[in-house]
């Protein structure tokens, strides 16, 4: 690490004193400043783009150039004649320029392609080759080079601190805009331009009457120059310990038709589509009633299967097959598109977990988990846009899965005695757990936008969800659990306990919006809508005896048959107006609620009306700087899962009993957001603060006995608050970039444990700083450090965990075709008294692609230092937890890739 810092310091020192500044003002013939003019410097001998800049709102530009080197300077702006001249300087130079308008506008497409950055209204266009260093393999690598663009830990693209709404390719949806599929599968060589579309909306009629500051999309323009073309790659690999990789990717694009095929079969830990991604994948369906003041959480993934930690496990086998298409007719008036995704993952998870319970017991478990997850997603979309006044769209999304998880678990319980630790456990239980579910859903959506005239706009949207979940749970164990609840037959060799569940959900949402344009800077919005939910919940617990017969328990508290109905009819009004630098949008919503749940012969009815104000203030300090405030109040309702009165297994040592008398909770949220995106000097600043408070909270009431708990839900007037703050600064220089970010998350809440009130706090702090080189003709290195502190306070127990993580990343293009990349991180994980674990990650790849050749040869090594385990910690109202899980060992993979662009059509 010290050597890396020393090398980086020498590079910065050497380059700082071997460069000079070329700066000045750019104006038109009338003396007006020209904002957004491109200034580029090309080395005359090598023809390499060595520097570029953009004039700011004062017309000022600055370039850092090498001393005594011959450059060709080009200054251009759309609608003006280009200024081209040669330059060679040995000291700082300041010079102003006047651009003349030309009779005919320059070809905008040509300018966008040649210039590194072009700004057109809310759109920023980056020329990928101007930022690439030569080591890029996929779209994610290209995007990471761009200022203000990040790829987060989940593989989702963030621009200007916000998750993007979608990614399109040549204006066509790529798997409905899913950024993870696009960034991991589009070859970097095919990327020509990246268009960042700010204030994005798919309904053009609503652009000037709705708030879209949080909506950002990315469009990828491909390198081709042809009306019809194929591209893609075939990738294969083999390694030690029977490691294999096969990944074909084929793409076809034409003006009126496009299609893509993605395949992947690997056991080297490369993610394709995880079970978590499956539930996240919305297929482009938006939260229809996000602003109506009502939230009802329709639970999914009810089986409670485990998720991978950062795509790490002892073994990961993954398969993916995906097809995407789009077809248009009559100059894009009518379009149909869709996709099919089939994925399967087979994971082996081996982990050790230590839980410190508030009851004073410590539980150590050793888990061996085998997961088999199969997912299918199908999407069909058709849209009809005959003119700029009418837009109609229909969407259909079908999802299904088959998930099976087998766990062999050993649980040892100890009394907490730091001064005199107990060697022998007070209880040991061998448990085999089977969890299985086959969820499915059909989601339909209809959207219609109609502009009657310049003052009247109508919007109608409706969604219908039909969902079925059937989680099954089985635990075979040595020790009888929950003796006071389940009347098990004790004259058996083991206790074989089973539970069936079936949850059917039917949800309809619809709303009609009317926008009345008062002036070019103000409008009224009237909305009427409805949310209607119907659910049926069935469950039963039974025991399988040694002779394979079933012992069914007929007690009401061990079975469920619940019907739940919920309806919200609402009217909302918002007044949006612009005055000076402010965009104001006060409003209110009137909701009429009615809910009913029927179980055990009893009917629980609840109905009431609520008026909820909301306020949004947007302050535009500059074109690139803004401050935003949002206030919302939301009624939060639970679904049938929290209302069912019969007992439900959460896991082997936890029962849950619903409460049919639960009422809605009130959620108040205050958000303040600041951002400054300076495209002229590539400095970005983001800050966010969020405060939330709940009243009549739905919270836990728990009976804890040893390591076993029975939890129920109640409404409580006890305060529940949370604070979240984050900030990020990143700065890009000519050959360097630096960044710093931090976030704080504090929550204070109350629970009732064994009849006693327990006030609990959680406070998490994260800091990350990095500095990196950004050369086109030299190796690049990034050095950084992250620090994480987590504190958990349950009143009687306090736990503190710390993780220090320095990291180094290297990528180098050299030798006319060689690319070397390496990624190293060291993690020092500890609590206040001892080191809990130290682990490192080191991955390295070396590839060779001869210029002009379609073949690429590569060798990659995963987990080069052969570390064996990784730690994570977490906290809830009953215990704090430290988890250590086994990761894949070191292995080497030899790869061969063929570029399918060689079979491109005409």
Sequence positions of predicted segments:
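Membrane-proximal, glycine/serine-rich, low-complexity loop/turn segments characteristic
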Residues: 19, 25, 31, 60, ...
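Short, ordered, surface-exposed loop/turn motifs in non-cytosolic proteins
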Residues: 30-44
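A short, solvent-exposed loop/turn motif at the edges and junctions
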Residues: 42-48, 70-85
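Short, acidic Ser/Thr/Gly-rich low-complexity loop/linker segments typical of extracellular
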Residues: 45-60
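Outer membrane beta-barrel strand-and-loop segments of large Gram-negative receptors
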Residues: 366, 507-509, 553-559, 657, ...
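Outer-membrane beta-barrel transmembrane domain signature of Gram-negative proteins
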Residues: 497-585, 597-602, 618-622, 717-728, ...
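Conserved C-terminal beta-signal and adjacent last beta-strands/turns
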Residues: 768-787, 799-906
């Amino acid at each position: 690490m010290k050597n890396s810092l020393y090398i980086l310091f020498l590079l910065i020192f050497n380059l700082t004193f071997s460069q000079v500044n070329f700066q000045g003002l750019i104006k038109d013939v009338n003396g007006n400043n020209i904002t957004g003019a491109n200034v580029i410097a090309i080395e005359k001998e090598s023809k390499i783009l060595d520097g570029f800049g953009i004039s700011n709102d004062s017309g000022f530009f600055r370039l850092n150039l090498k001393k005594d080197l011959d450059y060709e300077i080009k200054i251009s702006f759309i609608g003006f004649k280009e200024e081209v001249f040669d330059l060679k300087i040995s000291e700082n130079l300041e010079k102003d320029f006047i651009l003349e308008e030309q009779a005919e506008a320059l070809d905008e497409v040509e300018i966008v392609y040649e210039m590194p950055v072009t700004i057109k209204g809310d759109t920023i266009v980056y020329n990928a080759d101007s930022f690439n260093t030569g080591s890029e393999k996929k779209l994610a690598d290209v995007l990471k080079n761009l200022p203000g663009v990040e790829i987060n830990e989940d593989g989702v693209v963030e621009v200007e601190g916000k998750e993007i709404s979608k990614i399109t390719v040549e204006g066509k949806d790529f798997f409905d805009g899913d950024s993870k599929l696009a960034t991991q599968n589009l070859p970097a060589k095919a990327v020509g331009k990246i268009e960042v579309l700010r204030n994005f909306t798919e309904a053009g009629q609503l652009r000037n009457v709705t708030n879209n500051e949080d909506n950002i999309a990315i469009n990828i323009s491909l390198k081709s120059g042809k009306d019809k073309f194929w591209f893609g790659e075939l990738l294969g690999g083999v390694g030690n310990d029977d490691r294999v990789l096969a990944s074909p990717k084929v793409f076809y694009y034409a003006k009126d038709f496009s299609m893509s095929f993605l395949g992947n079969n690997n056991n080297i830990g490369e993610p394709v589509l995880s079970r978590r991604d499956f539930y996240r994948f919305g297929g482009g369906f938006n939260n229809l009633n996000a602003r109506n003041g009502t939230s009802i959480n329709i639970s999914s993934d009810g089986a409670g299967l485990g998720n991978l930690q950062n795509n790490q496990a002892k073994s990961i086998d993954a398969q993916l097959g995906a097809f995407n298409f789009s077809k248009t007719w009559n100059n894009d008036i009518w379009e149909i598109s869709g996709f099919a995704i089939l994925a399967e993952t087979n994971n082996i998870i081996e982990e050790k977990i230590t839980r410190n319970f508030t009851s004073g017991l410590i539980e150590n478990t050793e888990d061996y988990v085998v997961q088999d997850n199969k997912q299918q997603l199908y999407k069909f979309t058709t849209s009809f846009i005959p003119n700029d006044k009418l837009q109609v769209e229909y969407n259909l999304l079908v999802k299904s899965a088959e998930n099976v998880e087998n766990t062999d678990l050993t649980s040892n319980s100890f009394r907490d005695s730091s001064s005199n630790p107990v060697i022998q456990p007070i209880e040991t239980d061998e448990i085999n757990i089977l969890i299985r579910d086959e969820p499915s859903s059909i989601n339909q959506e209809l959207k219609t936008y109609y502009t009657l005239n310049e003052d009247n706009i109508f919007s109608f949207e409706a969604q219908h969800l039909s969902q079925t979940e059937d989680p099954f749970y089985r635990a075979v164990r040595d020790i009888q659990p929950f003796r006071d609840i389940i009347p098990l037959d004790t004259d058996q060799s083991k206790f074989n306990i089973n539970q069936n569940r079936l949850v059917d959900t039917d949800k309809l949402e619809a709303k009609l919006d009317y926008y009345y344009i008062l002036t070019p800077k103000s409008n009224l919005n009237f909305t009427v809508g409805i949310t209607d939910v119907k659910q049926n919940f069935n469950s039963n617990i039974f025991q399988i005896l040694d002779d394979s017969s079933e012992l069914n328990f007929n007690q009401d508290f061990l079975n469920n048959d619940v019907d739940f109905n919920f309806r919200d009819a609402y009217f909302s009004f918002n007044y949006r107006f612009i005055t000076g630098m402010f965009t104001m949008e006060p409003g209110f919503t009137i909701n009429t609620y009615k809910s009913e749940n029927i179980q055990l012969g009893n009917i629980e009815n609840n109905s009431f009306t609520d008026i909820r104000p909301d306020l949004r203030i947007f302050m535009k300090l500059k074109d690139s700087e803004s401050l935003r405030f949002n206030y919302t109040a939301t009624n939060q309702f639970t679904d049938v899962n929290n209302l069912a009165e019969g007992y439900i297994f959460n896991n082997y040592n936890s029962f849950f009993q619903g409460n049919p008398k639960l009422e809605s909770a009130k959620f108040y949220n205050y958000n303040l957001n600041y951002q400054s995106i300076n495209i002229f000097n590539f400095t970005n600043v983001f800050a966010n603060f969020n405060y939330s408070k709940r009243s009549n909270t739905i919270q836990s009431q728990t009976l804890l006995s040893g390591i076993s708990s029975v939890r129920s839900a109640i409404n409580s007037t006890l305060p529940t608050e949370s604070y979240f703050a984050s900030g990020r600064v990143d700065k890009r220089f000519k050959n360097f970039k630096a960044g710093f970010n931090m976030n704080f998350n504090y929550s204070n809440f109350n629970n009732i444990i064994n009849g006693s009130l327990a006030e609990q706090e959680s406070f998490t702090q994260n800091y990350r700083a990095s500095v990196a080189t950004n050369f086109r003709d030299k190796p690049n290195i990034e050095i950084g450090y992250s620090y994480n502190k987590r504190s958990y306070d349950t009143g009687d127990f306090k736990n503190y965990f710390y993780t220090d993580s320095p990291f180094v990343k290297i990528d180098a293009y050299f030798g006319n075709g060689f690319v070397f990349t390496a990624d190293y991180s060291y993690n020092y994980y500890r609590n206040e008294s001892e080191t809990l674990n130290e682990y490192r990650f080191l991955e390295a790849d070396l590839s060779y692609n001869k210029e002009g050749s379609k073949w690429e040869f590569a060798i990659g090594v995963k987990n080069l230092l052969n570390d064996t385990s990784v730690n994570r910690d977490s906290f809830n109202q009953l215990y704090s937890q430290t988890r250590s899980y086994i990761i894949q060992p070191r292995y080497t993979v030899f790869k061969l890739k063929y570029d399918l662009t060689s079979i491109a059509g005409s």
